[in-house]
């Protein structure tokens, strides 16, 4: 059985491999997802300038509730999409951070899509 430490090493290797071909621009920034055991974080990043354009997390006061982790991820996806559309961002590149497209990562992505982001 693969241990948690080994699982994270594999994820980091996968993320580094994907990031070589994945980059955000001012016209089409990158939506980065980080998932911890308790929270989920999303950032929209312009890699050319090295600037975070918008961010949302399950720790934000308007999102943090006593809900399941998947429900919180859905709220984070809706919040990041709203912040992006307020700044005029419609298209993004989705960076799942080496995580499988399943569960919380999938819930965040689908909520962002339904809220108006295109990827």
Swiss-Prot record:
This protein's UniProt keywords: Ribonucleoprotein, Ribosomal protein, RNA-binding, rRNA-binding
Any Gene Ontology biological process: translation
One Pfam family matching this protein: Ribosomal_L18p
Single Gene Ontology MF annotation: structural constituent of ribosome
GO cellular component: cytosolic large ribosomal subunit
Function: This is one of the proteins that bind and probably mediate the attachment of the 5S RNA into the large ribosomal subunit, where it forms part of the central protuberance.
Sequence similarity: Belongs to the universal ribosomal protein uL18 family.
NCBIfam families: L18_bact (TIGR00060)
Subunit composition and interactions: Part of the 50S ribosomal subunit; part of the 5S rRNA/L5/L18/L25 subcomplex. Contacts the 5S and 23S rRNAs.
Official protein name in the record: Large ribosomal subunit protein uL18
Name of the encoding gene: rplR
């Amino acid at each position: 059985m693969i241990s948690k430490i080994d699982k994270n090493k594999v994820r980091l290797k996968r993320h580094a491999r994907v990031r070589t071909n994945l980059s955000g621009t001012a016209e089409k920034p990158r939506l980065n997802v980080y998932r911890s055991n308790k929270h989920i974080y999303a950032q929209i990043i312009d890699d050319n300038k090295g600037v975070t354009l918008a961010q949302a997390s399950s720790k934000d006061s308007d999102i943090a509730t006593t809900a399941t982790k998947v429900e919180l991820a859905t709220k984070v996806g809706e919040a990041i999409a709203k912040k992006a559309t307020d700044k005029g961002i419609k298209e993004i590149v989705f960076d799942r951070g080496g995580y499988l497209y399943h569960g919380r990562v999938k819930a965040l992505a689908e909520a962002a899509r339904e809220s108006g982001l295109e990827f």
